[in-house]
């Protein structure tokens, strides 16, 4: 079993460091990679790399980020771990049915720095149609709002784990067309209609992220469906118009079903 790396692929080892002392520190990170002939690989493995971009933690406040992904194929999960930055105070991941119900906790931690990886023995068998649902909890001691991003000044919410056999699409919570299929689950009280109005009026990414965080859990499917339709230019129907003057009207028409469902959705 191995992970295949195609010719020309760039491998990036991304590490984060926070120096809380008054003196410089020397950072060091190393990794060992081992290769074997392609003809000896019987099964190709992959890496789940779920990333939830909808994070907004108010100044001196608390917040959560939650996302649910459908696993499209039968897979074996080797191990799993979280990734958050220093405001992360809790993480939990669950395996559930296609509706996200009947959940079984598969991983939990309160660590953001020395993150434990949970190895499954025997490996965790996940059936096609089951879901992985994970949540990151944050506590922000700073006098500024913190949102998602790549630096230590920002936050992240990720579920990571090697698995097999590989399906490149499901690694990023996407379908075979490359479209994200996850469900973003807010922790607020806003209905889908209110959330959509917030998104349309958002003038910055910070506000946009907050719109989703503030949505109610009961509207999660409707919120995610309309967002995914809009962000994919009407699931590709408006590619010829976007970007352009006719993009907005095309997307509104192409996403009419999702918009109507959103306006009708209630918090339950």
Annotate the PLM regions.
Residues 1-76, 81-185:
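Beta-strand-centric surfaces of beta-sandwich/beta-rich domains
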Residues 183-268:
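Mature extracellular/luminal domains of secreted and GPI-anchored eukaryotic proteins, especially small
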